[in-house]
């Protein structure tokens, strides 16, 4: 299939304000808008159409029904050819009651930025929301990657790249480990930290929970290959797809980091 949304690479500059507003010592839990894509190929729906009705129904109920223990939902509303697929995934530290506020923000953000689009994705710090007329369960989306990075460089670029990549790689293994379960469900998320010289790097990786563990690993390996483009020597960086993403910073940006990763020797 050809690109549904087209691919995009955002230059570092966009992230400057976002990344420079943090200090090492304070945990500021932001939920900044990051990016969106309106699908051109899926077209627009008409006012009063069955698609609109289905979309309105699913978006009006999405934050009020069900539980948010895994911060994820993939749901379908209506019947072919007017069915709507909606997926959201909250960040791994933003489940339960932390999740619905981000989704509400994302719903209004998506409606404002992609009015009447049948397909659209919006990214925030703490969640992702996607609507589509095309099913995507357990399919890696390779078409909508983008990255954000802090324009400032580390002095020891080589060491920093090597050690940060190694941390992310380790987290990718952990996130996609089939034995890394929350009850019976795959966790598909991992966070950790690591000392590099005098600095400490904080990092996370995550997949959307429609993926099976092998696909999660495949997705993460795909975006980790973009580390050189995104993140070469940068003091902070993130690569996003729709199906997975990673982030690292020199300050803590999550509500908590897992103990096992923190204690692991490097
Ligand atoms: C963190 O957030 C607090 C409250 O919103 C703000 O006063 C403070 O300046 C922020 N710190 C940084 C480093 O942005
Ligand atoms: C973060 O901490 C809370 C409460 O201690 C816990 O319920 C939650 O599972 C933790 N999240 C992660 C990702 O470890
Ligand atoms: C970081 O390094 C790159 C590549 O060497 C350079 O183009 C860029 O200007 C540097 N950024 C800063 C803020 O010095
Ligand atoms: C994580 O580490 C903290 C501090 O070392 C400890 O108090 C806490 O019980 C640990 N949590 C788990 C789930 O092991």
UniProtKB/Swiss-Prot annotation:
Q: Which Pfam families match?
A: Stress-antifung
Among CDD domains, the record links this protein to: Gnk2-like
Gene (name only): CRRSP41
What does the record list as coiled-coil region(s)?
A: none
Q: What is its main location?
A: secreted
Spell out the protein name for this chain.
Cysteine-rich repeat secretory protein 41
Q: Which residues form the Gnk2-homologous domain?
A: 33-136, 142-253
Task: Quote the InterPro entries the UniProt record gives.
Answer: CRR_secretory_protein, GNK2, GNK2_sf
The beginning of the lineage is:
Eukaryota, Viridiplantae, Streptophyta, Embryophyta, Tracheophyta
Query: According to its UniProt record, where is this protein located?
Result: Secreted
Cellular compartments per GO CC: extracellular region
Keyword annotations of the record:
Repeat, Secreted, Signal
Q: Which family does it belong to?
A: Belongs to the cysteine-rich repeat secretory protein family.
Q: Does the keyword Ion transport apply?
A: no
Signal peptide interval = 1-26
């Amino acid at each position: 299939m050809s690109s549904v949304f087209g691919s995009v690479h955002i230059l570092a500059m966009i992230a400057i304000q976002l990344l420079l507003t943090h200090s090492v010592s304070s945990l500021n839990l932001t939920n900044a808008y990051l990016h969106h894509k309106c699908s051109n190929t899926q077209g627009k729906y008409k006012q009063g159409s069955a698609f609109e009705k289905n979309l309105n129904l699913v978006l009006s109920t999405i934050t009020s029904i069900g539980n948010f223990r895994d911060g994820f939902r993939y749901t379908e509303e209506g019947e072919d050819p007017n069915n709507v697929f909606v997926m959201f995934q909250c960040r791994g530290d933003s489940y339960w009651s932390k999740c619905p506020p981000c989704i509400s923000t994302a719903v209004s953000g998506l409606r404002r930025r992609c009015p009447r689009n049948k397909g659209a994705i919006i990214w925030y710090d703490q969640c992702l929301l996607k609507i589509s007329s095309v099913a995507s369960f357990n399919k890696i989306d390779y078409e909508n990657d983008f990255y954000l990075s802090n324009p400032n460089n580390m002095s020891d670029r080589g060491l920093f790249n090597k050690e940060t990549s190694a941390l992310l790689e380790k987290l990718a293994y952990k996130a996609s480990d089939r034995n890394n379960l929350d009850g019976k469900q795959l966790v598909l998320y991992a966070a950790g930290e690591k000392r590099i010289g005098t600095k400490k790097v904080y990092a996370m990786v995550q997949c959307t929970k429609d993926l099976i563990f092998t696909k999660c690993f495949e997705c993460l390996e795909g975006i980790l290959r973009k580390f050189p483009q995104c993140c070469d020597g940068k003091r902070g960086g993130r690569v996003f797809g729709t199906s997975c993403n990673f982030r690292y910073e020199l300050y803590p940006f999550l509500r908590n980091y897992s103990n096992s990763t923190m204690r692991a020797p490097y």
